[in-house]
Each structure stands twice: as structure tokens, then as C-alpha cells.
């Protein structure tokens, strides 16, 4: 039954979330290690030094969890988009043209628009505004999955069904670009400018973990609940990240302050 499938999905999701939280909390404990033990961080390689410096920041655990789950809703749906197109009877040509080629162009356009909005309104506001738009786009696919019948021999897709899925794909691609622009701006803003490349790689690795989980869980969720129910559920996966925004705001302020203090003073 659908309700049992939902319960199982959330049990697995919470189990993974708790495990990740426990691991991050354990890593964050290194912040309280004796100062003498931190003197050799730099001698253990740039990656290790960057990791230790990152984990000693105040409030880093909630921020790492935010990075982990901010695009979880988008990733969870993304893995099942192509199977949904196929099961709905769309041709490989349509999938390649609309979902891939046009979708890529709209994602780039969304990235440009998201970058403009982030620059005008600031990273913090862009994260929750553009992140919300990114989540709402999942409902378009949920609607399409509820309306479009499964493919069957002899059936021809109606024009309105094609138009509905084309529209859902366009909105999802564009808003995905919006959210990505704000998210990448956030990652670049909080890295230490002295080791930006290394810290950015570490933070990107944390983000990649959510895609790994989403790839595994998406097939189970879609099979258990159907495409429409699963796409609708992914909409709600976006909101846990919003509870962590206070820590995100504090981290942005801390990074901005640290960057300002590092700038050389202007001398007359």
C-alpha cells in the first residue's frame, strides 16, 4: 500500500540522515582537540589542513548538513525523470531534444538569472527564494505524472499531455539553474580564500553524498509510490534545509567578516 511505502521511504531517509549527522558531529569534535595537536595540521598535506580548519569553524555541522540536503529534492526527482518519460511513451528523440538539449539551455539561462538575482539580493535571500522555486517545480512533474496515462500499445499521446510534460521539464530545468547559482555562490562565499580550491572540493564532496543517496532511494520510492506520489513527496524533501538557514546566515556573516579583516588596510 502507498502509506506503507511512504513510511518505509522515510525510515530509510531518516536512518541515513541520522547516520550522516552522527558522523559530522564526530568530525566536528576535532574542534575541541588540544591546541598542541593542531600545530602539525599543515605538515599533513593541504587537504588534511583544509579539512581540519573547516571542521573547527563554529556552527559547521548544521552548515554541512545544509549543503548535504539543499538540493536533495531536486536530485531525488532528477534520477526518475528519464524513466518517467520513457514509461509515458515519449520517444528517444523527444527525450533528447526537450529534456536534454533544451533543458540544458534552460538550466544555463536559469544559472545566469540566478546569478543576477544573487548579486542583487544577496546569497542568503537567494538561497531560500530560489531554493523554494526549485522545489515548487517538482510539483509540475507530480501533476504531469498524475494526468498522463502510462504508455500502452496502440495509444497515442495527446497534445495536451505532451504540452504539460514539456512545460514541466522547462520549468524544472530553469528553476534548477536558479537554485544551483545561489548554492554555488554560497559555497564560494564560505571557503577560506587562502585555500579556496581545496575547501570548495571538500564541500562539493559533501554535496555529492546527497546525490548518491538520492540515486539509491529514488528507484525504490518511484516503484513503491508511483511517479506522481514520488514526485509529490520530493517537493517536501526541500524543506528540512530551511530549518538550517539561521546557521547558514551566521556562517555567511562570519566568512564576510573574516574576508574583510584579511584585506589590507588602505593607507593614505
Spans of model-derived segments:
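Juxtamembrane intracellular "pre-TM" segments in multi-pass secondary transporters
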Residues: 1-4, 32-62
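Multi-pass alpha-helical transporter architecture, strongest
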Residues: 26-30, 230-264
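Short amphipathic helix-loop junctions that connect adjacent transmembrane helices
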Residues: 79-96
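Loop-to-transmembrane helix entry/capping segments in MFS-fold secondary transporters
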Residues: 92-93, 193-203
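Helix-to-loop junctions at the C-terminal end of transmembrane segments
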Residues: 109-123, 222-223
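Cytoplasmic membrane-interface "Motif A"-like loop-to-helix N-cap segments
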Residues: 119-133
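C-terminal ends and interior cores of transmembrane alpha-helices
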Residues: 132-158, 246
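Intracellular juxtamembrane helix-capping segments at the cytosolic ends
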Residues: 178-192
